[in-house]
C-alpha cells in the first residue's frame, strides 16, 4: 500500500483505538482460567489476532460475537504450532505461558520478530526445568515448570517479566529482576489486570512473587489507548488544527497517558474531560526535554511534533528503542531527516530541532509507529509525501489512514 499526503489542517473527532496491550493480556489470561471469559471492544489489529491464535494453541476455543469474543479455556489440550506474526508481546508472553503445557508448543513469527530479543527469556525457562529447543524463533517449548525461582534482566524488555508473572499464576514463581527495569508501566499493567481477575502479585524492591492462582475475568471492555491516540492529537499540533479523541480512560499522569501533560508542557492546549482528549494547535510550540524510559511507545508521538516546535526537543531514556519492530533510534531519525529535520541520536537519546519541513519519500521499515509518525509529519509539511508499506499500521490500528481522512488530511491510498 502507498499513501500520498499533502499539507493539511486537521479538524474533528475520532474514537480512540482500543489498547492492544490490555487486549493481549486479557486474552492470554483467559486461556489459563477455569471458566468462560467474555472480552469486548477488541481492537482490530494484527497483534490481537496473533494473541487469539496463541490461546487456541494453548487449548482454548475462541467464539467471535460482533466486537466481543468468548474464550472457553482448556489448558490440558494445549500443544501445536502457532505463528504470531510480528507481535513481540504475544511471542514473549506466549512463550512463557507455553511452559505450562505438557505437550510441545512451537512458536514462530515473521522476519522482524526473529530479530527481536528472546534468548534471555528462554534461558530463564530452562533454569525452571522447561524443555526449550532453540534460541530464537521458531522455538519449541515443552513443560511443565519444575522450579519456582528465576533471575532475569529487566533492561531489554519488560515483556520478559510480564510473561513470567503470568506463568507464575500456573506454577508459582519468585522473580528477581536484574538491573534497571524499562517500560515499567507495562509490568504495572500486567499486575493490575491480574489483580482485577482476583489474583495477586507481590513486589518488594527487585523481587516479584506470584502464587498459584486461577484468574477469573468478568465481562471486560478493552479501554482506549493513549499512545495510539496521540498520533491523532499530534496532527492538531503539526497542522494548526483541533482534534478530539473520544473514549479514553481518565489519565493517571504516568505511563502513556502522560502525553496529555507532555503536550501541555510543549505549549499546546491539551485538555481531558469526560473521556475526551482535545488538543488545539496554532499556538507556539516549544521544544521540551522528556524521559520516556517507562513509556517508550510515546517516542514516535513526541518525535512527530518536535519538528514543529521552536528550539530543540530532547527525548531520553530510550536505549531499548533499538529492540522494537525496527531500531527506532535509527528509523525515527532517518524518517525525520527525509522531511528535512535536523536529528541526532545517541545510545539513549534523541535530539530533534524545530525545522521547516518538506515532503518526503518514506519506505516504512514494517514498523506501525514509524508509519504513523511519518503520516503526522507529512500532514504538516510543504509538498507531497509518499509513504510505502503503509499497511504496516494494521499491526495496531487498521483504521489509522481512514481516520486521518476523516480528520481532513489530504490523503490518497494506492
Curated annotation (Swiss-Prot):
GO terms for molecular function: 3-phosphoshikimate 1-carboxyvinyltransferase activity. The lineage of its organism: Archaea, Thermoproteota, Thermoprotei, Thermoproteales, Thermoproteaceae. Its EC number is 2.5.1.19. InterPro entries: Enolpyruvate_Tfrase_dom, Enolpyruvate_Tfrase_sf, EPSP_synthase, RNA3'P_cycl/enolpyr_Trfase_a/b. Keywords: Amino-acid biosynthesis, Aromatic amino acid biosynthesis, Cytoplasm, Transferase. This is 3-phosphoshikimate 1-carboxyvinyltransferase. GO terms for biological process: amino acid biosynthetic process; aromatic amino acid family biosynthetic process; chorismate biosynthetic process. The keyword Cytoplasm applies. Pathway: Metabolic intermediate biosynthesis; chorismate biosynthesis. Pfam families: EPSP_synthase (PF00275). It comes from Caldivirga maquilingensis (strain ATCC 700844 / DSM 13496 / JCM 10307 / IC-167). Catalyzes the transfer of the enolpyruvyl moiety of phosphoenolpyruvate (PEP) to the 5-hydroxyl of shikimate-3-phosphate (S3P) to produce enolpyruvyl shikimate-3-phosphate and inorganic phosphate. CDD domains: EPSP_synthase (cd01556). GO terms for cellular component: cytoplasm. It is an enzyme of class 2 (transferase). Belongs to the EPSP synthase family. 3-phosphoshikimate binds at residues 20-21, 25, 157-159, 183, 297, 324. Signal peptide: none annotated. The gene is aroA.
Amino acid at each position: 500500500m502507498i499513501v500520498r499526503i499533502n499539507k493539511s489542517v486537521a479538524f474533528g473527532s475520532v474514537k480512540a483505538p482500543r489498547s492492544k496491550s490490555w487486549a493481549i493480556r486479557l486474552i492470554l489470561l483467559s486461556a489459563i482460567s477455569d471458566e468462560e471469559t467474555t472480552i469486548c471492544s477488541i481492537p482490530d489489529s494484527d497483534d490481537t489476532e496473533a494473541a487469539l491464535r496463541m490461546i487456541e494453541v494453548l487449548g482454548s476455543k475462541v467464539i467471535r460475537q460482533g466486537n466481543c469474543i468468548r474464550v472457553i479455556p482448556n489448558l490440558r489440550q494445549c500443544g501445536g504450532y502457532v505463528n504470531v506474526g510480528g507481535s513481540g508481546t504475544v511471542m514473549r508472553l506466549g512463550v512463557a505461558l507455553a511452559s505450562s503445557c505438557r505437550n510441545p508448543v512451537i512458536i514462530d513469527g515473521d522476519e522482524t520478530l526473529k530479530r527481536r530479543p528472546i534468548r534471555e527469556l528462554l534461558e530463564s525457562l530452562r533454569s525452571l526445568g522447561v524443555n526449550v529447543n532453540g534460541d530464537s524463533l521458531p522455538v519449541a517449548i515443552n513443560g511443565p515448570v519444575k522450579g519456582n525461582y528465576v533471575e532475569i534482566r529487566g533492561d531489554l524488555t519488560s515483556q520478559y517479566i510480564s510473561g513470567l508473572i503470568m506463568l507464575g499464576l500456573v506454577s508459582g514463581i519468585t522473580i528477581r529482576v536484574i538491573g534497571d527495569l524499562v517500560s515499567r508501566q507495562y509490568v504495572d499493567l500486567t499486575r493490575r489486570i491480574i489483580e482485577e481477575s482476583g489474583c495477586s502479585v507481590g513486589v518488594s524492591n527487585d523481587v516479584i512473587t506470584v502464587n498459584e492462582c486461577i484468574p477469573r475475568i468478568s465481562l471486560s471492555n478493552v479501554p482506549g489507548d493513549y499512545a495510539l491516540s496521540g498520533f491523532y492529537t499530534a496532527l492538531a499540533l503539526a497542522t494548526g488544527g483541533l482534534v478530539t479523541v473520544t473514549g479514553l480512560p481518565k489519565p493517571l499522569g504516568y505511563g502513556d497517558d502522560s502525553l496529555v501533560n507532555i503536550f501541555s508542557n510543549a505549549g499546546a492546549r491539551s485538555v481531558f474531560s469526560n473521556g475526551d482528549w482535545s488538543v488545539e494547535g496554532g499556538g507556539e510550540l516549544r521544544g521540551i526535554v522528556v524521559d520516556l524510559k517507562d513509556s517508550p511507545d510515546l517516542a514516535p508521538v513526541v518525535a512527530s511534533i518536535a519538528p514543529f516546535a521552536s528550539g530543540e526537543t530532547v527525548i531520553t531514556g530510550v536505549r531499548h528503542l533499538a529492540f522494537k519492530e525496527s531500531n527506532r533510534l535509527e528509523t525515527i531519525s532517518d524518517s525525520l531527516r527525509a522531511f528535512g529535520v535536523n536529528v541526532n541520536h545517541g545510545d539513549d537519546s534523541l535530539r530533534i530541532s524545530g525545522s521547516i519541513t518538506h515532503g518526503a519519500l518514506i519506505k516504512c521499515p514494517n514498523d506501525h509507529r514509524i508509519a504513523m509518525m511519518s503520516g503526522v509529519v507529512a500532514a504538516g509539511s510543504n509538498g507531497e509525501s509518499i509513504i510505502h508499506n503503509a499497511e504496516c499500521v494494521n499491526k495496531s490500528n487498521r483504521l489509522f489512514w481512514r481516520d486521518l481522512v476523516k480528520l481532513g488530511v489530504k490523503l490518497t491510498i494506492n
